[in-house]
Amino acid sequence: MVQCLDGVRQLLAVVFKCCDLELKQPRGLEDPQVLARETVFSVSEVEALYELFKKISSAVIDDGLINKEEFQLALFKTSKKESLFADRVFDLFDTKHNGILGFDEFARALSVFHPSAPLDEKIDFSFQLYDLKQQGYIERQEVKQMVVATLAESGMNLSDEIIESIIDKTFEEADTKHDGRIDKEEWRNLVLRHPSLLKNMTLQYLKDITTTFPSFVFHSQVDDT
């Protein structure tokens, strides 16, 4: 009987300990220390980022997850504006490929946009943005799709002739292997020569995430060089 009671006490101790942990750690928030080790965010930044995540995830459906509509709303302040850029970013954030973002996906993916994120991570992510077919290289049509989409989002209207000229110049410089496509190595070399290609890959206000919650907005702009 004594042994039985001891067993019950041990079981209750475990239950209370688990309940205590759940109370201390918000539902949906992975261990901040784990995320801090796997991203460029500090523990306090991870916790602040979670507050931002909760605001975005409750914009349409308060379920603790971000769907594409909420993502669009956070990006462009409207859920109706179609954007190839936003679609690509969402798809790359959605590593589980289930059409929704949990906080772990949100934090890990957003880490690449932090000013302190390694350059190689930014280059790799930007390459994936253009690699629409996920073939490991960028084709001419993919570049055109992104250029046209970026121009439209920026409110700029260029003739097809000028757009084709821009793409011609891009491939003339980037496609050093002359095979009609841009691979990761060629993309990296192009970006290193033209760092402005990565200007959309850095969100300066992520440095101040612990003190303020700025609008989560990517400003898609055309390279002005």
UniProtKB/Swiss-Prot annotation:
Per the UniProt record, the site (Involved in dimerization) maps to 154
- Please give an example of a GO cellular component term from this record: aleurone grain membrane
Q: Which residues form the EF-hand domain?
A: 45-80, 81-116, 118-153, 162-197
Q: What is its main location?
A: membrane
Q: Does the keyword Membrane apply?
A: yes
Gene3D superfamilies given in the database record: EF-hand
Name of this protein:
Calcineurin B-like protein 2
Query: What family does the database annotate?
Result: Belongs to the calcineurin regulatory subunit family.
Xref: InterPro entries: CNBL1-10, EF-hand-dom_pair, EF_hand_dom
Q: Where in the cell is it found?
A: Vacuole, Aleurone grain membrane
Coiled coil regions, renumbered to chain: none
Output the SMART domains linked to this UniProt entry: EFh
Q: Which UniProt keywords apply?
A: Membrane, Repeat, Vacuole
Its quaternary organisation is: Homodimer.
Q: Which PROSITE patterns match?
A: EF_HAND_2
Describe the function of this protein.
Acts as a calcium sensor. May promote vacuolation of aleurone cells in response to signal induced by gibberellin. CBL proteins interact with CIPK serine-threonine protein kinases. Binding of a CBL protein to the regulatory NAF domain of a CIPK protein lead to the activation of the kinase in a calcium-dependent manner.
GO biological processes = calcium-mediated signaling
